[in-house]
Amino acid sequence: YVDEFIFGIANNKLISAKTGTGEVDLQARYLRFDDYTFLKKGEDRSAYSTRLWPTAKGSHLALFPNLNNNNKVLQSILRDVRFRRALSMAVDRYEINQVIYYGLAIEGNNTVLPESPLYKSYYRSRWAQLDLKASNKLLDDMGLTERDSRGIRLMPDGNPLNLIVETAGESTEQTDILELIHDNWLKIGIKIYSKPSQRNVFRNRIFAGETAISIWSGIENGLASANSSPAEFAPTTQQLLQWPKWGQNFETDGK
């Protein structure tokens, strides 16, 4: 039995620093993978051990195209499954794993984990292998064949396919990953810009249909079973970043 627990209240931005100086005995929340190197360096000095624990989410981070984007031309593009598959096959997950996660991550899609009884290996691997040739072909098949002088594909309205990927601004890890994605998406004629903000602004922009793509953690329950709620996989709530307006419509009975 433990005689006493003492919970210290601190700004979440200070948690990793306080942990690294040995001020806490046990800490998990508010420690991110981008704190890993800093924490490992402090082990001998502050007499603690840094442990890596697997997450129960479908993916540590995932990209969410907003199928309810207000721009009707862009909305039509985002809703085309060929476009989303093209984006996925132009993400070099191996590079991200090596550069950001020191090769310690598992590469693949945002889906249930191998420990889930519903898991199938192709859920994680389908459209998740780097294949720029296949990506370019899918985009060509969509009719996005015209390009500007920079090589950026043009949308049907003549505007370049410049996409803003929005983040909650809480971690440099997300912007570092987007920098790596940026280089490969340029090779398929798509230019992206990362836009950090604050969490409430980030979510409100998504809910309002102002966001094209956002980056956030994957499905909450990566260990789903036949008895689990399937709500995360259908537009049942505004909180789901890929279809917030459909979710809102469901929650309000269309009102």
Regions found by a protein language model. Name each.
Residues 1-102, 106-107, 115-255:
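Extracytoplasmic/periplasmic ligand-capture domains
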